[in-house]
């Protein structure tokens, strides 16, 4: 037995429920209202405390007779509307064959499409689940990772997961992400002794030391890439000394860098490398890293072939399998099963 859900109507209803990170309440009511009549058991959780919470999360499961469990992961939160909107970003509007509204692409439209597909799937087929968070665009501390803990406590483990992030480049369906690079942000603090520029012998200027540290880091070539990943890259993103005077040697200097790395590296190893370089120049230098996610790869196989066949059937395109771009919650979910 199957049902019918119009994905456009559902997408419009989701867009019409404002859900800037962290999303809670009304937008989850809309999704739950669509899933319950389809036979899904829906659980909603409030996870976390300030400053990164509370966050609402939703886990919906419809058990089937088939042997496979197919999961869909997504997020209902959106980034705040920027300038340039010609109307209310939370009032969905169809112009021609395009749907406009905050979250239409990332990713309320994808969630609506999957719910419509689930409605059209016989209830006696394999098990379907939706893993939906209210915090993917923000800190993501109490989002998908918290949902994974709920799943583990309930013994829920999909065989494969599709993440509904937009990955197309020029045409819908032209690219599928089968992996993502890891990401780590690193802060370097170099201490010194404040003083007057006329008396440098009474001060200890941290800026030349920081410059030497950054120069040494800049000379590092992490790798030449792999079969599936582009070369890892180090980018300096900020330098600050907090010095508004022209005649004062600052007491400290700080820099921030970001590393996007492939699966030849681990985040902690890169933080340790930067720390060694910094302390070779200044033993008192402090290095702190924040790993957003490790690199992962889902080698081409059953899941990517299934997705490619579905795309080809609907669009006539053969999608490119890629690992380019930024991170997504797939960086957490790959620990459960193959994910694209």
Language-model features: locations:
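Metal-dependent amide/peptide-bond hydrolase catalytic core
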Residues: 1-3, 80, 167-171, 178, ...
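N-terminal helical capping/dimerization or prosegment-like subdomains
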Residues: 1-81, 252-258, 270-276
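Short glycine/serine- and small hydrophobic-enriched flexible loop segments
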Residues: 13, 116-122, 212-219
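Short alpha-helix boundary/capping segments
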Residues: 41, 99-106, 198-206
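A structural signal for short hydrophobic beta-strand segments in well-ordered beta-sheet cores
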Residues: 42, 60, 92-94, 236-239, ...
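Active-site metal-coordination/substrate-binding segment of hydrolases
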Residues: 69-132, 154
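Acidic/histidine-rich catalytic neighborhood of metal-dependent amide-processing enzymes
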Residues: 107-179
């Amino acid at each position: 037995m199957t049902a019918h859900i119009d994905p456009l109507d559902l997408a419009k209803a989701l867009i019409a429920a404002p859900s800037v990170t962290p999303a809670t309440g009304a937008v989850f009511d809309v999704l739950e209202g669509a899933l319950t009549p389809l036979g899904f058991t829906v659980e909603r959780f409030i996870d976390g405390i300030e400053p990164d919470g509370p966050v609402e999360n939703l886990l919906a499961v419809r058990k089937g007779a088939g042997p496979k469990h197919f999961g869909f992961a997504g997020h209902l939160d959106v980034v705040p509307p920027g300038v340039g909107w010609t109307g209310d970003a939370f009032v969905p509007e169809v112009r021609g064959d395009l749907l406009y509204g905050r979250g239409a692409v990332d990713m309320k439209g994808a969630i609506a499409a999957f719910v419509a597909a689930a409605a059209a799937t016989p209830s006696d087929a394999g098990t379907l689940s939706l893993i939906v968070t209210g915090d993917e665009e923000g800190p993501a501390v109490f989002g998908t990772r918290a949902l994974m803990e709920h799943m583990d406590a309930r013994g829920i483990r999909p065989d494969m997961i599709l993440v509904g992030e937009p990955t197309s480049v020029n045409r819908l369906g032209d690219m599928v992400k089968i992996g993502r690079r890891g990401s780590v942000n690193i802060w370097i603090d170099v201490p010194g002794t404040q003083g007057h520029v006329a008396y440098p012998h009474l001060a200890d200027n941290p800026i030349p030391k920081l410059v030497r540290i950054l120069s040494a880091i800049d000379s590092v070539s992490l790798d030449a890439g792999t079969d599936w990943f582009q070369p890892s890259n180090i980018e300096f993103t900020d330098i600050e000394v907090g010095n508004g005077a022209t005649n004062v040697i600052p007491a400290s200097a700080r820099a921030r860098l970001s590393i996007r790395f492939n699966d030849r590296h681990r985040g902690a190893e890169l933080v340790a490398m930067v720390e060694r370089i910094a302390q070779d120049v200044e033993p008192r230098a402090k290095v702190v890293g924040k790993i957003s996610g490790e690199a992962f790869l889902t080698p081409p196989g059953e899941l990517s072939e299934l997705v490619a066949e579905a795309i080809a059937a609907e669009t006539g395109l053969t999608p490119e399998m890629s690992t380019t771009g930024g991170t997504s919650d797939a960086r957490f979910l790959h620990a459960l099963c193959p994910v694209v």
